[in-house]
């Protein structure tokens, strides 16, 4: 299998799926397409030897799954190896170079985030919604414009951020540090200005991230939630009841903004939909008082760049009314 040749023949390809003994499948414009080539056992051996570090090879043998990332020219690829029915399988996500992607229509929001000196910024959405790309855009802006120290914690490192004005250390879980909480504790001893977390998976990581934000650092993180309004509750309820009041206070004081996004595909067109929550004084009060259900009413007012997903949908350009109606139903 030659990934570069596959990309040349299918420039819109976003994913490659491999199952031992079966034809390759690629995802193009959101749909899977069967190829003629068969995924032979040797292909998996080559993937593992070429792109998976020894420690992760051992993890694959022990647990049946492993993650890695690698570069092919201007393209980064994220590799997930797993077994299914006793057969070797793999999913490869194509991460195109940021400069080759179209402009993000929320450039103003991205630039404001990149200029923040402290606080917690969350990027949320389902798998494949572009969270990593949004994070990379923000980090690239920081690198271009700020003489600061950025520490990222990723599993694995996806986009490699060029060092321009900023000093950047991209640490990979398993390779460079044991886990996210340990990485945050380490980062606080590394004189960071910005800490970026590939994923906030558990209460220990969330707690460490809030502490880092409270101590004067800019913390960027991602969460698997689909709507911005649900983020405060998602974070608070990750903790036992006796800590929730404390976490409410920390979140209300340190959260700056949330971007929740989704990709909508129709034919060969793809739209990024993003709703934005800004932690203005009224929103912080709602979080502190446990009244998160009232947050959408403030988002709908459009203050401080806030908007709901429905408002983002109505602002979409180049989409037919039929498509808009179909998208509206998917949001309900």
Regions found by a protein language model. Name each.
Residues 1-332:
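Short, flexible helix-loop junctions that flank or precede catalytic/ligand sites
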